[in-house]
Every structure is written in structure tokens, then in C-alpha cells.
Amino acid sequence: STSRRQRQMCIRDRNKIPYKEYTYECDEFVDALKVADTLGQPYELLYKTLVTIGNSRNYFVFVIPIAEELDMKKAAKSVGEKSVSMIHVKDINQVTGYIRGGCTAIGMKKQYVTRIDESAQKLEKMIVSGGRLGVQIELKPEDLKKASRGEFADIIFKQPE
């Protein structure tokens, strides 16, 4: 919604976060890899936002590269939970205020504990959802961390060397 979007922009502005906005035609959920292709951006720069629920019934937000998979054990450990599981797609809006494909760690309904995959620390910039379908924002990983009050953590599956 517009108010959610305005709230995000307020958070970014309040934190004096410079960002670049990308818009593209989109009226339904599309795979994140397709979004990267549409924007002509390398997959490594785009990150998706996943929402989970822990044993404690608390919600947790994880931001990971679009081509990677969340390691549930590492994710749970990073937030001090025994286990976490993905929330049901139908619950995304109720929990976050966003819709599937438009979910971002900035400006959710409530402030949830957020972990950003440590791979983002190596990047100068990253691209995440702008809070609605058809909008992506580019910002520094440190700025996403600040605006989401998140922490960097090792939360994705690693291929055995």
C-alpha cells in the first residue's frame, strides 16, 4: 500500500540512506531470477526477503541472494531458535504488510529480528524489493542493515568444497 511505501521511504530518509529505485512492469509474483534478468542485473546483486516463524512463535526475517537457499539450521542458530520454518504464503501480508514478491526487510508492520546473509558484506551495493511488485531498490548492504536493524550472518547453504 502507499502508506507502507511512504513508511519505507521515511525510514530510508530518516537514516539518510541513499538509494536508487528501479521500476518495471509487473502485476503478479515473478521469480527473482526473472526480475534480475528484466533489470539486466547480475544475480549476485539481488537479494530476496524470506519470513520465518521460530519455535518461540516469533517471526524472523532473512535476506539472502536470489539464487541461494536459506539453511534453516544456520538461520535458526543465528536468531537463537531451536528451529525456524517458512511462513505460509497466505500469511505474508498479515505478518509483514507486504505481498509475496514485494516483501522487504524495511518498514514491515512490526520490527522483526533480521539477518542478512554475510555475502552482502563483500558487495558495494545490493538490490532488494522496494516494498511492492515492480519496484526494486539498490542500496549499500550497511544501509540495509541499519534501516532494518539487522545483522549479517552465515545463513545460506554452502556447497561442500
PLM features: what roles do these ranges have?
Residues 1-11:
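Single conserved hydrophobic/aromatic residue that forms the stacking wall/gate
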Residues 8, 14-38:
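N-terminal polybasic phosphate/anion-binding patch
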Residues 38, 67-68, 76-81, 131, ...:
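Short, solvent-exposed amphipathic alpha-helical segments in soluble enzyme
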Residues 53-91:
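Helix-adjacent hinge/juxtasegments
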